[in-house]
A protein has these predicted regions:
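Core catalytic machinery and nucleic-acid-binding channels of phosphodiester-processing enzymes
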Residues: 1-224
Length: 224
């Protein structure tokens, strides 16, 4: 240490105590320090423009199936894309094309993660393209674990109800806000899933699937 006398300073000692306590608390919580970032999920807007302006019903886009573009990470590497917290096995390992595709670099100019129009990644992650975020991880250990544990796993798919169209009136806005505050409580459902995963013996994945379905229905509940 360059300045050992700093250890005698009361402020420095208090700061070190707080740092130590914080590290111990995180360790007790079982949190993993991994190389990852939260970022927005964005569709391939080049493909959207092909459909919108050129009338192409089957656009090629700039990304192939199994590819994503995220300039937060080195290109050419595999990334684990997941929702956090994830409930079932929503891991999508995809190849990052950042820095590899020059045309994509010209079009994809934000720090979000862009997904291919040929990919079922939105079904795996159960995300919409309206501000949903993903946890994107480049840690090799996590990527390999995700690939290993999702072999043979198919995405959960179910038809969700959709609220009927209503005019934007003060009364309808008010009733929607009331419904959003009264409903949409996913904590109890998520906790039940956590208990199953933490039991040490996950014998019935169907229970997790059904609870995940209920959780997603609760999040996107329809307001009649």
């Amino acid at each position: 240490m360059l300045y050992p006398e700093l250890l005698q300073d009361e402020y420095c000692r208090d700061t070190l105590r707080m740092i130590k306590a914080s590290l111990e608390k995180e360790a007790h919580a079982g949190r993993l320090d991994i190389a990852g970032k939260y970022t927005f999920l964005i569709p391939d807007m080049y493909a959207f423009c092909q459909w919108l302006f050129l009338g192409n019903k089957d656009p090629s886009g700039l990304l192939e199936n199994g590819e994503v573009y995220c300039r937060l990470f080195e290109g050419g590497k595999e990334l684990d894309c997941l929702r956090s917290p994830h409930l079932y096995l929503e891991h999508a390992v995809r190849r990052n094309m950042a820095g590899v595709n020059d045309e994509a670099k010209r079009w994809f100019q934000t720090n979000g993660i862009y997904t291919s129009c040929h990919d079922l990644i939105t079904k795996i992650l159960q995300n919409d393209c309206d501000g949903d975020k993903a946890l994107v991880v480049e840690d090799v250990g996590v990527v390999e674990a995700a690939k290993r544990n999702t072999k043979g796993i198919v995405p959960l798919y179910y038809e969700m109800a959709k609220a009927g169209a209503k005019p934007l009136t003060p009364e309808n806005i008010y009733s929607s806000m009331i419904a959003a505050f009264v409903g949409g409580n996913i904590g109890a459902i998520s906790n039940q899933i956590t208990k199953i995963w933490n039991s040490g013996t996950v014998d019935n994945l169907d229970a997790v699937k059904l609870l995940c379905l209920e959780n997603n229905f609760t999040i996107d509940q329809s307001v009649a």
